[in-house]
Every structure is written in structure tokens, then in C-alpha cells.
Amino acid sequence: MQEFHSSKDSLPCPATSWDNSVFTNSNVQGSSSLTDNNTLSLTMEMKQTGFQMQHYDSSSTQSTGGESYSEVASLSEPTNRYGHNIVVTHLSGYKENPENPIGSHSISKVSQDSVVLPIEAASWPLHGNVTPHFNGFLSFPYASQHTVQHPQIRGLVPSRMPLPHNIPENEPIFVNAKQYQAILRRRERRAKLEAQNKLIKVRKPYLHESRHLHALKRVRGSGGRFLNTKKHQESNSSLSPPFLIPPHVFKNSPGKFRQMDISRGGVVSSVSTTSCSDITGNNNDMFQQNPQFRFSGYPSNHHVSVLM
């Protein structure tokens, strides 16, 4: 046991070496204090050294003792005088020393790696609550009626889109140019009818689905209106060309025959039909006597057939 002098002016060298040994021992124990047993033994040792340091009046020894105590306390889990653990809940890098025997609050720098947060503090979610939104705008439960923004204005949504069911009365409805012109025409027509005191004709809805299916099958014109089937058939028949007439076989029979006007190129120009009552015997003699009406490739006694 070495003898210590109580003089305030000077301290022997063994005292300084003892202080250095305390620093080294405290650092080693603080670095290895990962279990509860090491922590308890370290705190008991520091309490004993704290009581021994109170007997000395030197300010240098008190400052070194306070620094060593604060350094060890920063490395180990701090406990107060009543045995309750003190949990550090902030990560600012500084902490107060509640066990300073002198009474002065010494603040020591604490690294973030040595601070252990409790389970409640460590279980905080890293992301906040996701606010529901659609195309960058808040949903209707979070946005008021006066702050509802329409995506059609910014060009985020195409021109034609289904209208929502819960539309406020004061909110505008966006339509394309064609629909807008139709709305204006209907408004003008209604205004004229109201000025003339005429009743506006209300369209009746379909009473059955079969009527709707029949309307879908009907022929429509260019404007989308229904066309009359009889007029449609007459127009088709009037537009049919004459060369679409089905071909007939021309027979040299006493009952009927067809008179043909053949052009110089051999193309049929017109067709005329006559009955046997209107034909005299001179026509038969004309066909038999005139050789220019005979075909060179066929004999005169064979029947001539022409296909249109």
C-alpha cells in the first residue's frame, strides 16, 4: 500500500500512475462491458473510486476523476442512485451525467453507435402514412368541394371519359367540341319551341330489349338515321347498270327471236325484244337472204347463241 500525501501543492508520482491505471482499466472495462455482470462490477468500482477521490482536495484530481467517471458512464449503461436504468432517447450526440457526486452536470460526448434505443423507439416506421391520390391529386375524402381539380384541364386524361356518379351540382362537366355543338343546337331548338308555346317531344324509352336489338340491325344512313327499306331497294334497282341483266340464249325458233344491232367492232350496243305477232315473213327472208348477218365461222344451218 503506497502512502499518499495530502498536500495541495504537489502530488507524488505513484498517484499519477494510479490515475493512469484507472484510465486504462476503465477504458478496457468499458469496451468489454456488454453483459450485465460487467456493468454492475464497473459501477461498483467507480463508486468506490468516487468515495476515495472525495478525500482529496486537489482540483486536478477531482477534474480527472470526474472525466474518468463521465467517460466510463458514457460507455456503460447509466444507472441512478435508486437502481433504475436511464434510457437515452435522443441521438443528438450529447447526454447529461446524472451520477456526478459533486453536483455539477458534466456533459460528455456520446457516439451514436454506443447508444441503444428501446424497443418502442426503435420500432418507429421509417415511412409515413400514404395519402391516397389519383394522378397527382388528392382523393375526394381529403379534398373539399371547392378545391377539386379536374385532370382534363392539364391534359392528363383523354377527352372522352365516363362521368363519375357522385358529381356535385355546381361542378362543370367537360365535353368535347362535337358534344358541345350538339348541346348548343338542342338548347336553341328548345328555346324556339318554348317561344312558340309548343310542347317539347319527349322520347319514350324502349319497352323491351328486342326493340333495341332490332334498331341495331336496321340500316342507317350517313347521319345515323334509319332508312326506309322499300326506298332503299328502289334506289338500288335504279342504280343497277344494263349489263347486269342475266344472259339469255338466242334461239332461231318460229315462236320468239331477238333482233340484235351489232356494231362494226362486234360489241352489242342495244337489245330489243319483239314477239312473233309483230314480225312478218319479210324479216325471216331478210335474215336468210342477207349474207352479212351470217357468221363466217359457223354454217347457216346451225343455231346461233350469243351470251351477254
From Swiss-Prot:
It is found in: Nucleus. GO terms for molecular function: DNA binding; DNA-binding transcription factor activity. A motif (Subunit association domain (SAD)) lies at residues 174-197. Transmembrane segments: none annotated. Residues 204-229 bind DNA. SMART domains: CBF. Pfam families: CBFB_NFYA (PF02045). Its main location: nucleus. Keywords: Activator, DNA-binding, Nucleus, Transcription, Transcription regulation. Residues 53-76 are annotated as: Disordered. One of its GO terms (cellular component) is CCAAT-binding factor complex. One of its GO terms (biological process) is embryo development ending in seed dormancy. Expressed in flowers and siliques. Disulfide bonds: none annotated. Stimulates the transcription of various genes by recognizing and binding to a CCAAT motif in promoters. Heterotrimeric transcription factor composed of three components, NF-YA, NF-YB and NF-YC. NF-YB and NF-YC must interact and dimerize for NF-YA association and DNA binding. Belongs to the NFYA/HAP2 subunit family. This is Nuclear transcription factor Y subunit A-6. It comes from Arabidopsis thaliana.
